[in-house]
Structure formats: structure tokens, C-alpha cells
From Swiss-Prot:
One Pfam match: Ribosomal_L28
Database matches in InterPro entries: Bacterial_rp_bL28, Ribosomal_bL28, Ribosomal_bL28/bL31-like_sf, Ribosomal_bL28_bact-type, Ribosomal_bL28_sf
GO cellular component assignments: ribonucleoprotein complex; ribosome
Region (Disordered) location: 1-26
PANTHER family per UniProt: 50S RIBOSOMAL PROTEIN L28, LARGE RIBOSOMAL SUBUNIT PROTEIN BL28A
Gene it is expressed from: rpmB
GO molecular-function term, one example from the UniProt record: structural constituent of ribosome
This protein's name: Large ribosomal subunit protein bL28
Compositional bias annotation for Polar residues: 13-25
GO biological process: translation
Signal peptide stretch: none
HAMAP family: Ribosomal_bL28
Gene3D superfamilies (UniProt xref): Ribosomal protein L28/L24
Lineage: Bacteria, Bacillati, Bacillota, Bacilli, Lactobacillales
Organism for this UniProt entry: Leuconostoc citreum (strain KM20)
């Protein structure tokens, strides 16, 4: 599985708990998107970013979509 190029977000693992508090393993996957961007004015590059990182970067100007 890929990871976020900026924050390093990866799949997280934990337990799923039923009402009886039985546990079974489960995972939470980040919402990764493959996008072509310029990060801090560098050359355009295809990277994996979470939707959250992409939204924040576009808003504060550190990421520019190509």
C-alpha cells in the first residue's frame, strides 16, 4: 500500500469491538489520491496524497495542481 508523500499517512490497524466487547482485527485506510502537483514550487510530480493533505495544501498555497 502506498503512503502520503507529505504526511506519511499509511493504513492503521486496531480492533473492531462488538456490543459484547469481542475483538477482531480491522484496518483504517487513508483516502489516497494520485495527483500531479507542484510542492513548494518544485517541478511537477505525480504523488499520492490524502484528500485531507491535498485540501489543506491547496488552501494554504504550498501545493499547486498541474
Amino acid at each position: 500500500m502506498a503512503k502520503d508523500a507529505i504526511t506519511g499517512a499509511r493504513t492503521r490497524f486496531g480492533n473492531q469491538r462488538s456490543h459484547a466487547l469481542n475483538s477482531s482485527r480491522r484496518s483504517w485506510k487513508p483516502n489516497l489520491q494520485k495527483v500531479t502537483v507542484k510542492i513548494n514550487g518544485a517541478a511537477a510530480k505525480k504523488v499520492y496524497l490524502t484528500a485531507r493533505t491535498l485540501k489543506a495544501g491547496l488552501k494554504n498555497g504550498s501545493i499547486e495542481r498541474v
